[in-house]
């Protein structure tokens, strides 16, 4: 079983681990957050240079982001001993980062559904992007994305990303489906798989944006109450069709391998694993587009080891490390120069994870961001993430 992003929505009890001993988851939304006022830490001045390492680095991360093969060389080169706590969800990350990391944590590998909570909670602070040399090699849309850059201030450096794809059986679908409508179709009752995650409400909203234009949805993460209700009702109607709300990639892989499901929302990792095993599956991004995740290394407001943190962010942004992580984790690197290295690690690895896709591919993805009550237009009539969580419990219960 691959241990990685798929544990995000599973309760995790992992404690502080010494990484060296560890064996081991677009149309952009403008300047999200700009209308919410000034983040509490915007005035904290980032350093102009990186000094000597403090000798240690404490990280909160998704399991799989701190593999020994790239952590050990970092420790040897910098003298920064890496310690990590693996978090099981974005909400757990936000909780652990309370009070600016509590003078304990230095960095967190936050996803888009946590970024704004951390930024506006005052738990992370701006960084000097000029101290990350490889940032210039990033995909343009990940240099200053709205989910981690507010009012021109960078609250972290983008890392890896990926889309939520429509995975389907080629035995059942002789021609590729063109719409997300298939996962809401009674024709496939009991044969649909869906991620067990409240952010799935955004996927429903994205579909409704074109399926029911009268709702006026323009951003699947900024929903008024009527728009939110429509998405929730769609997902409640879908419930009898769902074979499994999956929280591990291995669960969805097994269902497709066994022929128990024929269509579902997935990530590139599931597809590549199934194809490698000879399963008759393919994927597409439907006409409505897709949601997706993008992770960011964010610096704790009260980080006790900022120099080691900057050294880590710079190291993890290099093509070699991004390529290794992408292949190990099953996602797409932010650094464009990682593509050829991915192919040396896994034949066809670059194409398998869309690292060489044209910009038109990336513009079909709406990346996760935290649903807040204050909409991007300044109105306070959007449904916040707490209500998303409550609704998801009702949908899946």
Which residues make up each language-model segment?
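C-terminal region of N-terminal signal peptides and the immediate post-cleavage residues
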Residues: 21-42
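Extracytoplasmic ligand-binding site segments that recognize negatively charged/polar headgroups
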Residues: 60-61, 65-67, 92, 104-105, ...
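Conserved C-terminal helix/tail region of periplasmic/extracytoplasmic solute-binding proteins
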Residues: 363-397
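Paired acidic/hydrophobic, glycine-rich loop segments that form the ligand-binding mouth/hinge
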Residues: 105-109, 245, 262-267, 282-283
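Ligand-binding "clamshell"
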Residues: 118-127, 150-153, 273-285, 349-350
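Mature extracytoplasmic/periplasmic domains
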Residues: 300-366
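Extracytoplasmic/periplasmic substrate-recognition and gating elements
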Residues: 266, 275-328, 397
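Early extracytoplasmic/lumenal segment of secretory-pathway proteins
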Residues: 35-118
């Amino acid at each position: 079983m691959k241990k990685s992003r798929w544990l995000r929505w599973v309760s995790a009890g992992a404690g502080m681990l010494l990484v060296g001993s560890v064996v081991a988851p677009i149309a952009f939304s403008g300047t999200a957050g700009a209308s919410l006022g000034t983040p509490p830490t915007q005035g904290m001045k980032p350093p102009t240079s990186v000094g000597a390492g403090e000798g240690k680095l404490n990280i909160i991360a998704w399991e799989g982001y701190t593999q020994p093969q790239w952590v050990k060389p970092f420790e040897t080169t910098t003298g920064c001993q890496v310690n990590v706590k693996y978090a099981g969800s974005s909400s757990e990350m936000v909780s652990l980062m309370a009070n600016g990391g509590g003078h304990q944590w230095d960095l967190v590998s936050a996803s888009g559904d946590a970024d704004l909570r951390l930024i506006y909670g005052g738990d992370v602070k701006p960084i000097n992007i000029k101290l990350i040399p490889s940032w210039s090699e990033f995909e343009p849309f990940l240099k200053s994305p709205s989910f981690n850059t507010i009012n021109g201030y960078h609250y972290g450096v983008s890392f890896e990303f990926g889309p939520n794809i429509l995975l389907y059986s080629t035995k059942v679908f002789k021609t590729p489906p063109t719409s997300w409508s298939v996962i809401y179709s009674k024709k496939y009752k009991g044969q649909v798989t869906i991620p067990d995650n409240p952010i799935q409400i955004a996927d429903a909203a994205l579909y409704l944006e074109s399926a029911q234009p009268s709702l006026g949805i323009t951003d699947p993460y900024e929903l008024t109450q009527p728009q939110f209700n429509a998405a929730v009702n769609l997902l409640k109607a879908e419930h009898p069709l769902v074979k499994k709300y999956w929280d591990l990639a291995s669960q969805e892989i097994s269902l497709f391998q066994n022929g128990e499901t024929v269509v579902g929302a997935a990530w590139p990792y599931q597809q590549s694993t199934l194809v490698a095993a000879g399963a008759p599956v393919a994927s597409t991004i439907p006409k409505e587009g897709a949601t997706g995740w993008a992770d960011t290394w964010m610096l704790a407001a009260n980080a006790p080891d900022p120099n080691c943190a900057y050294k880590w962010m710079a190291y993890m942004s290099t093509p070699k490390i991004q390529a290794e992580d992408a292949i190990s984790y099953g996602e797409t690197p932010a650094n464009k120069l990682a593509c050829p290295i991915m192919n040396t690690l896994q034949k066809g690895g670059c194409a398998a994870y869309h690292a060489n896709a044209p910009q038109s591919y990336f513009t079909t993805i709406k990346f996760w961001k935290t649903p807040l009550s204050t909409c991007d237009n300044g109105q306070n009539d959007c449904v916040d993430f707490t209500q998303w969580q409550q609704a998801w419990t009702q949908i899946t219960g």
